[in-house]
Amino acid sequence: MLSLQTLAKKALAKQSVPEEYHYILKYCGLWWQNKPIHLCDYCNYVIVNSTPFKGELHLDVALIMAIKENNHDLIRLFTEWGANIYYGLSCARTEYTQELCRKLGAKDGLDKKDIFISLLHHKTSNNIILCHEIFNKNPMLEILNMQDFGEEIHRELKHLIFYILDNVPINTLNKYWYAIAVKYKLKRAISFFYQTYDHLNMWRLMCAISFNNVFDLHEIYEQKIVHMDIDKMMHLACMEDDNFLTIYYCFVLGADIDQAINVTLWHHQTNNLCFCKDLKDLKEQNGLTARPLLLPNITDPKKIYTMLKNYLPISSNSR
């Protein structure tokens, strides 16, 4: 049961407090990185404005950040508010912080591979960001054997594995977590990594194309976050089969459809090949073979998804 003091702090953190009264928040310990702590009124998220990420962080993530900072008051506060301290000892940097985490219920002797696998078993924005915070800039886990994670990374990334390899293992993991966020359309995690790693914008674009995430691809293109040659974009889209959404988007932007057909042939992607041939018929307005399902010049991702969600490739031999 929460103490009266804990309940009072929680209630205060949910209020909109004018700036002239911020000293009260500071006095009550509702202060972090020179900014007031706000708690979401309807969920277990802390609203932050002082880290590289501006937005809502789950209490579990905020707790790991506080542990890595050796901020004992916040460790106690976030734990009292319901944050899970299970992984705390994996990030505690001092003996005192380690002892505090133990008293609050942290698990001893966790293996880094077990942390990685258990958190990513359920791919949510919170778990992806939490995994990132546990491993990133963590002296306790700085010696990583990428063979421990290689099978999982290769299974998820497939062809993109050739673009992720880095001499610094933690850089490889950062790219991997970003890729998972894009692949599974985890908007909160995408926003987190976009704000935290602006030098990985090209990687985000590559992931959106390769994982058929036309919604993120459209956002990147509309906001002009980063630029890539349109035929290179189409090449990436064609490398993974059934990437109809991003192939179509690249086609509408002007990618060479004949070149795309050659790429699908080279990579033996049969469904993509049939789709690219349908797009070529659409471009040439071939009424005999063009699929009535396909419409030209649509860039709205919702309309593209609706148009293609029931698309089935038909072999040219059966036409």
Curated annotation (Swiss-Prot):
Record-level GO BP terms: symbiont-mediated suppression of host innate immune response; symbiont-mediated suppression of host JAK-STAT cascade via inhibition of STAT1 activity; symbiont-mediated suppression of host JAK-STAT cascade via inhibition of STAT2 activity; symbiont-mediated suppression of host type I interferon-mediated signaling pathway; taxis
One family name in Pfam for this protein: ASFV_360
InterPro entries: ASFV_MGF360
Assembly, per entry: Interacts with host STAT1; this interaction mediates STAT1 degradation through apoptosis. Interacts with host STAT2; this interaction mediates STAT2 degradation through the proteasome.
Superkingdom: Viruses
Function: Plays a role in virus cell tropism, and may be required for efficient virus replication in macrophages. In addition, inhibits IFN-beta-induced IFN-stimulated genes (ISGs) transcription. Mechanistically, degrades host STAT1 and STAT2 through apoptosis and ubiquitin-proteasome pathways respectively.
Family: Belongs to the asfivirus MGF 360 family.
Protein name: Protein MGF 360-9L
Subcellular location: Host cytoplasm
Triggers of expression: Expressed in the early phase of the viral replicative cycle.
Signal sequence residues: none
GO cellular component, one term: host cell cytoplasm
Alphabetically ordered keywords of this record: Early protein, Host cytoplasm, Host-virus interaction, Inhibition of host innate immune response by virus, Inhibition of host interferon signaling pathway by virus, Inhibition of host STAT1 by virus, Inhibition of host STAT2 by virus, Interferon antiviral system evasion, Viral immunoevasion
UniProt key word Lipid biosynthesis: no
Principal subcellular localisation of the protein: host cell
Keyword Ligase listed: no
